[in-house]
């Protein structure tokens, strides 16, 4: 192999005409014309068409006839300009081809579990092979094949370029990159830790870091001044569709700074990395206080690409004749809603009443929903007669409503429930009516978070216990005062997604001790968990602050990729499992004994292979009862089963699936080893409603996996009838 001569497939141009080139890569596609063989050869830079003609080299042609998809090969040949009319506009190299004179097969490939080629070899058009048609677990099981796809290679390259841009920018600002420990001490940071048992120190454990929080603060106390790290973090969280147990974040900390320093450098950094994906962000980023975000959007991650902010109208309708409102208000409740501008025609009475009021709003937790339309300067609805003219005018003025607008209102004694329901309705309606601008990115700083919140009757940190209170003087035993304290914390939100957050840190030991006391930690607990950190605060700690940005989530947004799993080389699946390596797996008994962990752990069975238990799933993992089937998991099942239903039907389906979990132990205990598979003999029908015909599928995408297409025809399996 003479790798020094190698030319990349995607870099061949007309300037190479007449030259001998050496190509190496994988067979992407094959087309056999009987007396001439064409292949697409793919490498990291692109695809080139190679022609095997027996008149040029009979031996190479004969060997090429044995090629199959994904064989790794080397081709030597001469570059030629394609004849007019045979160019392929879908390839960067579509104007040239290579006539092979020599072929070396490095290694062969088995039949593929799914198609890798993304550009079928066709004339004058491009047929895309979509990974959406392949089960995600199958893609992850054969991740090394999945990553061969050009689109996945492009994502990994872009990821590298984005991280490179981050490093170069921070280097210009005199930040230095320092690695912090992976094997560290377990400290309370919001999620559960992954624990690592120590062989040397029997019965003791390290913890994998949820973030480098304490170490980066210690670096500031060490005089480092400006630190950053592309940090790997680990959190043993409950399963969520777009979370990973291990993830990457940009971790950053600086001394002798305030919030404005963080805002300035992070805005510039964010603008730069988004530009790598062709996305322009407006500066300066607007800022919104936490209280305003909750009051007007029902979330601390508001999507400000569209309007529909909430308004409280309780004072306007407190004496209304509408008994539902009046009763809720008398019980201390609230009436709140938003205005949908110019959508009275799109949101018909049937849609508002029978869909949103009766089904969709209740699926979000509401007991109902009130709606009104503005028609010819007046409100119209099925309950408007209970409102005086003054109340109607007051509602229109408060919402800024005009002709053609629709008012959506929720009433309840729980203000938290109102915010949650309105937040879900706002996003649902905006998505349904396509009110969210495409290819629009609106960053936002959310600041002045509460320092503490109440969980299960106990005070806990809203972010983490190292955030500077505002003001710093407070009584750690005064519950009312604690819950009224703000913090110098801030989150960066883009299009309703939190990309990161940070704060100005506590740099005085007395203040830090008061926070620990407010959280209910005793002196002994404080010393055991944080004694090393408190001692560092006694030696002239500088004012400091920082931020952490989720690299995976940011890259997914920059590249418009729906799942963070597609921007990570080897991610875990939705159940925190690795279908490729089958991690996590049972440990050998000898390893457990060496770690002094005793016999309370499941071990590999002697003589049964690595995954021998009958109570394991197909990936070799012990079957455990899921806590709850989420709406995202319902949508995933529906997609695999080719089911289509609306939100209210999804809620019913979710309820039915969760009810099955009540029988989990019974089903798990059934011995099905000798039971033969049975045919489904029940009538298959939709029990919710009559089936609705879907849109007709185009033929070409349906046949996109057919291996060959010529003269308008695909080769497909022939049906043999007896």
Mark where each language-model region is.
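Class II aminoacyl-tRNA synthetase catalytic cores and aaRS-like
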Residues: 1-621
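Domain-scale activation on soluble regions of proteins
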Residues: 79, 610, 614-722
């Amino acid at each position: 192999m003479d790798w020094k001569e190698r030319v990349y497939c995607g870099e061949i141009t007309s300037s190479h005409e007449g030259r001998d080139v050496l190509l190496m890569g994988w067979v992407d596609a094959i087309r056999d014309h009987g007396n001439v063989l064409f292949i697409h050869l793919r490498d990291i830079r692109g695809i080139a068409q190679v022609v095997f003609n027996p008149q040029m080299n009979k031996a190479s042609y004969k060997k090429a006839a044995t090629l199959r998809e994904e064989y790794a090969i080397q081709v030597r040949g001469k570059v030629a300009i394609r004849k007019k009319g045979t160019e392929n506009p879908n390839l960067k190299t579509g104007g040239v081809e290579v006539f092979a004179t020599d072929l070396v097969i490095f290694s062969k490939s088995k039949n593929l579990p799914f198609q890798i080629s993304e550009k079928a070899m066709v004339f004058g058009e491009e047929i895309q092979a979509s990974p959406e048609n392949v089960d995600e677990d199958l893609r992850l099981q054969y991740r090394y094949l999945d990553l061969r796809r050009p689109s996945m290679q492009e994502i990994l390259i872009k990821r590298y370029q984005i991280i490179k841009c981050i490093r170069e920018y921070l280097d210009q600002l005199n930040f230095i990159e320092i690695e912090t420990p992976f094997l560290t001490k377990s400290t309370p940071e919001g999620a559960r830790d992954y624990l690592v048992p120590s062989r040397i120190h029997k019965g003791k454990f390290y913890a994998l870091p949820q973030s480098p929080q304490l170490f980066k603060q210690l670096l500031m106390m060490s005089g480092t001044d400006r630190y950053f790290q592309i940090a790997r973090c680990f959190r043993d969280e409950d399963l969520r569709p777009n979370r990973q147990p291990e993830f990457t974040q940009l971790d950053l900390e600086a001394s002798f700074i305030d919030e404005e320093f963080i805002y300035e450098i992070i805005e510039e950094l964010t603008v730069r990395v988004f530009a790598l994906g062709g996305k322009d962000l407006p500066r300066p980023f607007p800022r919104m206080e936490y209280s305003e975000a909750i009051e007007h959007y029902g979330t601390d991650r508001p999507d400000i690409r569209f309007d529909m902010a909430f308004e409280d109208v309780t004072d306007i309708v407190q004496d209304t004749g509408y008994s539902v409102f009046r009763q809720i208000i008398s019980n201390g409740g609230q009436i709140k809603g938003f205005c949908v501008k110019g959508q009275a025609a799109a949101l018909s009475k049937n849609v508002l009443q029978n869909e949103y009021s009766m089904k969709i709003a209740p699926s979000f937790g509401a007991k109902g929903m009130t709606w009104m339309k503005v028609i010819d300067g007046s409100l119209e609805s099925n309950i408007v007669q209970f409102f005086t003219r003054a109340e109607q005018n007051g509602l229109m003025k408060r919402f800024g409503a005009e002709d053609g607008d629709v008012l959506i209102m929720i009433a309840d004694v729980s203000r938290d429930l109102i915010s949650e329901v309105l937040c879900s309705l706002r996003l649902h309606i905006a998505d349904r009516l396509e009110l969210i601008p495409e290819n629009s990115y609106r960053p936002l700083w959310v600041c002045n978070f509460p320092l503490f919140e109440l969980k299960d009757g106990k005070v806990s940190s809203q972010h983490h216990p190292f955030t500077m209170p505002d003001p710093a003087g407070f009584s750690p035993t005064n519950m009312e005062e604690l819950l009224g304290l703000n913090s110098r914390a801030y989150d960066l939100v883009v299009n309703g997604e939190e990309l990161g957050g940070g704060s100005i840190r506590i740099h005085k030991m007395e203040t830090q001790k008061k926070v620990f006391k407010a959280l209910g930690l005793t002196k002994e607990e404080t010393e055991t968990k944080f004694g090393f950190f408190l001692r560092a605060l006694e030696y002239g700690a500088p004012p400091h602050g920082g931020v952490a940005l989720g690299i995976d989530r940011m890259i997914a947004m920059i590249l418009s990729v729906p799942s963070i799993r597609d921007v990570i080389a080897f991610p875990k699946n939705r159940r925190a499992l690795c279908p490729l390596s089958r991690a996590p797996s049972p440990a050998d008994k000898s390893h457990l004994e060496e770690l002094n962990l005793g016999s309370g752990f499941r071990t590999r069975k002697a003589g049964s292979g690595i995954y021998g238990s009958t109570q394991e799933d197909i990936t070799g993992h012990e079957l455990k009862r899921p806590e709850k089937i989420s709406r995202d998991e319902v949508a995933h099942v529906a997609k695999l089963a080719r089911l289509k239903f609306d939100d209210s039907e999804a809620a019913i389906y979710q309820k039915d699936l969760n009810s099955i979990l009540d029988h989990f132990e019974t089903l798990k205990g059934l011995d099905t080893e000798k039971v033969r598979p049975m045919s489904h003999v029940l009538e298959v029908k939709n029990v919710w409603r009559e089936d609705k015909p879907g849109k007709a599928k185009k033929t070409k995408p349906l046949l996109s996996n057919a291996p060959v297409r010529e003269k308008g025809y695909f080769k497909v399996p022939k049906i043999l009838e007896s």
